[in-house]
Amino acid sequence: MFKHETVLLHETVDMLEVKPDGIYVDATLGGAGHSEYLLNKLNEKGHLFAFDQDQTAIDNAKIKLADYSDKVTFIKANFRDMKEALNERGIEAVDGILYDLGVSSPQLDERERGFSYHQDAALDMRMDQEQELTAKTVVNEWSYQDLIRIFFQYGEEKFSKQIAREIERRREVKPIETTGELVDIIKTAIPAPARRKGGHPGKRTFQAIRIAVNDELGAVEDSLEKALTLLKPGGRISVITFHSLEDRITKQLFQEATKGPDLPPGLPVIPDEYKPDFKLATRKPIVPSEEELEQNNRARSAKLRVIEKIIK
């Protein structure tokens, strides 16, 4: 069964200031926790469009949200294609959009998906099972330099060179097929003192490969840029991030959007066209409460940022 602890459930949806008759988007359906809470706030005129590129997530959400079937439309697509998918359905603007950028726990926990460094499985890591690029391709075919780049940039891994070198050495003997083999390579490459602290030694490398396979950071940037253009005045976007790379992208995009164009010097009054279109609804990111952290350890690194389109 598709189980997923929803992080910052109330905060994320409540910060959207949901209108009962509004049109909303859940860009990351996952376990449908946020969607369910949001649908509860809509009347018969309100509607939710829920996106996921994982068919399993959609199939399970259809069962979970069966009572709301007339108020929700499920769309199997990467959220970077959200604007086009909504436009195709006649939707040009929406009242709110939410993102939960954590990988759904079921995807991490399903052995055959190849995300987990705790269980041996084929190297896969695709969110969209119809996509061609897999973790096996990255590990066996990407150059030494590209592996260093993704391990360092996406995993913030100190031992990127050592791990890439060991991968290169092993794959010359035979292809690297499984997550277990990759974990063994990582453990060989990382010096013993470093292996003993900071959680599982494979954590950063696996994160880096997953981000690369799914082009996660590129998709986040594309999607958020389009999301800003979809908002009605007064509408809001809530974004939960789980690591510094996504948070940096979100923070920079939001700051850029709230700046407004450069002003000519010496203006006594700022004309409307020079006023920014957006304002931050959260000066500092909202983080989970101690109570939530006790119940769900995966929420530890979560940060929620919210932006609002200004009514002019």
Swiss-Prot record:
Reaction equations catalysed: cytidine(1402) in 16S rRNA + S-adenosyl-L-methionine = N(4)-methylcytidine(1402) in 16S rRNA + S-adenosyl-L-homocysteine + H(+)
UniProt keyword list: Cytoplasm, Methyltransferase, rRNA processing, S-adenosyl-L-methionine, Transferase
Tagged with keyword Transmembrane helix: no
Domain of life of the native organism: Bacteria
Gene Ontology cellular-component annotations: cytoplasm
Pfam families referenced in this protein's UniProt entry, alphabetically: Methyltransf_5
Compartment annotation: Cytoplasm
Positions bound to S-adenosyl-L-methionine: 32-34, 52, 79, 100, 107
Gene3D superfamilies to which the protein is assigned, alphabetical: Putative methyltransferase TM0872, insert domain, Vaccinia Virus protein VP39
Recorded GO MF terms: rRNA (cytosine-N4-)-methyltransferase activity
SUPFAM superfamilies: Putative methyltransferase TM0872, insert domain, S-adenosyl-L-methionine-dependent methyltransferases
Gene Ontology biological process terms from the UniProt entry: rRNA base methylation
Enzyme nomenclature, EC number: 2.1.1.199
NCBIfam families: 16S rRNA (cytosine(1402)-N(4))-methyltransferase RsmH
Role played: Specifically methylates the N4 position of cytidine in position 1402 (C1402) of 16S rRNA.
HAMAP family: 16SrRNA_methyltr_H (MF_01007)
PANTHER family recorded: 12S RRNA N4-METHYLCYTIDINE METHYLTRANSFERASE, S-ADENOSYL-METHYLTRANSFERASE MRAW
Family the entry assigns: Belongs to the methyltransferase superfamily. RsmH family.
Protein name: Ribosomal RNA small subunit methyltransferase H
Originating organism: Listeria monocytogenes serotype 4a (strain HCC23)
